[in-house]
Amino acid sequence: MSNGVNAPLARHAMAYVLAGGRGSRLMELTDRRAKPAVYFGGKSRIIDFALSNALNSGIRRIAVATQYKAHSLIRHLQHGWNFFRPERNESFDILPASQRVSEELWYLGTADAVYQNIDIIESYDPQFIVLLAGDHIYKMDYEQMLQQHVEQGADVTVGCLEVPRREASGFGVMAVDADDVIHSFVEKPANPPPMPGKPTMSLASMGIYVFDTKFLFEELRRDAADPNSSHDFGKDIIPYIVKHGKAVAHSFDRSCIRSHAEAASYWRDVGTVDAYWAANIDLCDIVPELDLYDHNWPIWTYGEIVPPAKFVHDKIGRRGEAISSLVSGGCIISGSTLRQTLLFTGVRVHSYSTIEQAVILPYVDVARSCQLTNVVIDRGVRIPEGLVVGEDPELDAARFHRTDAGICLITQPMIDRLEA
């Protein structure tokens, strides 16, 4: 973990996290919460990864801009990220959209979400702004990116990674020269340009940017005065700097935190139900690509005070057991079997049930004799006795949200309709 001695640039930086998006492709999972507040990995929220990266990198001033259905997110931040101390020059600010610039406007775009809070940022006088998206899963040392930004004299440094070209239309895509200077940038192109020598890959923006604070404010004020701008970093700010200034690409491979030297870099969008399910289930592997057990780069979060998980009953056909699964505190597995399943806090599984490849959010109650396969179950759902999911695709699609890959998202309103 970086600290104030070996991370001098980070101690002069503020991390500004954009956490206002809904994440509509997650369907009903974001009906009640913003995407950054969605649960991940057994006990965390998605936003905890960006925040933990900032903290572990040595950054001690953090701000989070919120907008869409922010209550769950704000409550989590208040509970889990309240340990910053002003007397140590630390700060943690939650910045809901509050019509600070105009009484008629909320945040109009990602750039506007920073512009409306310029006065708050100025009060802390950071030298650098590390601008982050709050809805991705990855581990990264931002100090490395700050160092490249300073060494190359960049106006903006953009975090980037290689993605399959067929997936690149959802990203900002760039082209760079031998010195990593960006000479073209297009946001979410319909036909993403390939990388030289790699026709199936594109170089994509991670939505992570480093700016000198003074330069950023100048650009935000210029953009705010442009009536033709959508006030978005990817669509407006970055392309303008590429054309009129110096934009540099920072490869994620240079600063990602790996579980071991040979490990591949890990970054996930988890923006769809399928991707969300897969990234959680991957954690059940013997050696998962994402290492949550790394004490040198912990993922900080709010931990409820709950008792240990408990497994009860040991009879043939009624044995409480879990194979290749993650089971969080407060769970009780009563005479049922879990395989490749991830349970969040406080889940109760009653007897004679079999659950396979499931992601079950906190405080779900699964009644007796259920067979659940390839499911994501939202927080607090009460699964009725004898429910079978994962065996009849047509029936599943009629009752729940079933993806093309066969993953069923189950919420309480869906269960209520079954019982009506």
Swiss-Prot record:
Keyword annotations from UniProtKB, A to Z: ATP-binding, Carbohydrate metabolism, Glycogen biosynthesis, Glycogen metabolism, Nucleotide-binding, Nucleotidyltransferase, Transferase
Residues reported in the UniProt entry to bind alpha-D-glucose 1-phosphate: 107, 172, 187-188, 205
Top enzyme category: transferase
PROSITE patterns per the UniProt record, alphabetical: ADP_GLC_PYROPHOSPH_1 (PS00808), ADP_GLC_PYROPHOSPH_2 (PS00809), ADP_GLC_PYROPHOSPH_3 (PS00810)
Gene3D superfamilies: Hexapeptide repeat proteins, Spore Coat Polysaccharide Biosynthesis Protein SpsA, Chain A
UniProt signal peptide: none
Record GO terms (molecular function): ATP binding; glucose-1-phosphate adenylyltransferase activity
Domain of life assignment: Bacteria
Single biological process term from Gene Ontology: glycogen biosynthetic process
Catalytic function, reaction form: alpha-D-glucose 1-phosphate + ATP + H(+) = ADP-alpha-D-glucose + diphosphate
Pathway it works in: Glycan biosynthesis; glycogen biosynthesis
EC number of this enzyme: 2.7.7.27
Pfam families in the cross-refs: Hexapep_GlmU, NTP_transferase
Database matches in HAMAP family: GlgC
Record's subunit section: Homotetramer.
Function: Involved in the biosynthesis of ADP-glucose, a building block required for the elongation reactions to produce glycogen. Catalyzes the reaction between ATP and alpha-D-glucose 1-phosphate (G1P) to produce pyrophosphate and ADP-Glc.
Protein family per UniProt: Belongs to the bacterial/plant glucose-1-phosphate adenylyltransferase family.
Alphabetical list of PANTHER family matching this protein: GLUCOSE-1-PHOSPHATE ADENYLYLTRANSFERASE, GLUCOSE-1-PHOSPHATE ADENYLYLTRANSFERASE-RELATED
Name of the protein described by the UniProt record: Glucose-1-phosphate adenylyltransferase
Record organism: Rhodopseudomonas palustris (strain BisB18)
